[in-house]
Amino acid sequence: MFERLLLAEVAVVDVTIDNANVFYELGVRHAARPGTTIITSGKDGGLPFDIAMLRAIQYRLTDGALSPESAAAFTEALAVRVGDALARSDVADSPLFQLIPGFPGIALPRDYQSTFRDRADELRRIRERLEAARILEGAARTEAIATVDRDLGAIGADDLEPAIDVLAAYRDAGALDELIALVERMPPGLRRASVTVNQLYAFALNRRNTGTDRDHAISVLEALVAKESPSSETAGLMARVFKDWFAETRSADPFLASGYLQQAIEWYRRGFLADPREYYPGVNLCTLLAIDGGDEALAELRRTLPAVVFAVGRLGGIASTDYWVVASAFELAIAGNDWPLATRALSRMRTLARTQPWMLHSTANNLTLLRAAAPKSIDPKNLEGVLRSLAAG
């Protein structure tokens, strides 16, 4: 990432979401290059204080998405700004270069620039091969990804970015054994240093669930938490392990299952509090609070539900074209006993998942847990009806 920030002819930085990493990287770019940095934002109310005076391209979001009209206007404005930036690359847009005349910036040696460009070209080719693998199915898809994996050879620091792309491709293909094998092939120091690698590793261990896989997943996630406050993603992965244990033990050992349920709730709560804009842990928190069904849990559900509904609504709610956003709005409607909204969401989900029915089955798993718990806050007749509709695909 730093190489790209230092060497890219033009950098487009979107600050719609107040992400600390993005602002840090914007600062790196401004310290290194005098010009050709373009800021974009879909935030209402202007830019944050420290960059409020900088020139930015504003665009309008409607229900968390760009309308065709807004997208066309944004594309035109961005094309003009990129052209201007390239034509007038000597004009400083960095506040640091504007403040200190003659500030030298950072100039990398020419041979290093050539090496970086070669690596960037190789990364582009790897991503094209992985994208081509996505259209394949079953063993053919996994083998296409494995071919890229084998071509990587021994994983060094310079190979981390393409290795993460391969890991993500394995995850999307459901090739858990291959994902785990690639992580375990990495040098231990490199593996420990990457949060993303460890998150993908824990995800795969939990889903594979062979032998002590889940205990190992917990250890991996605990090591991440020990290094830094848990992110929404890390907390959500931890919660998922306990949620799966809850689902597997609720019939045979209800007392043990109750303990797993409370730990899952705690981790989903921590994930949502870490970043209330991330709807995934919030939706699961609401569903598990409804499954708990106790007075305290239902009181927390009533407090939490509006915030999670808002987070999902920012991304379009049931009007979204993303299945998981609509499915989240669906689950929240059920948790809030809003059956008319749940019915509308379900209709849209079925159209979005028409070529991938496994998505509907995944959503049904949460509702099956809800039905088994039979919480007093959820209407059982309506719940049974939506489960039948999900099963129909």
Regions found by a protein language model. Give the residues of each.
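C-terminal interaction surface of TIR/SEFIR-family domains
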Residues: R55-R129
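Alpha-helical linker/edge segments of TPR/alpha-solenoid repeat scaffolds
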Residues: R208-D213, W245-A252, L289-R302, G336-L341, ...
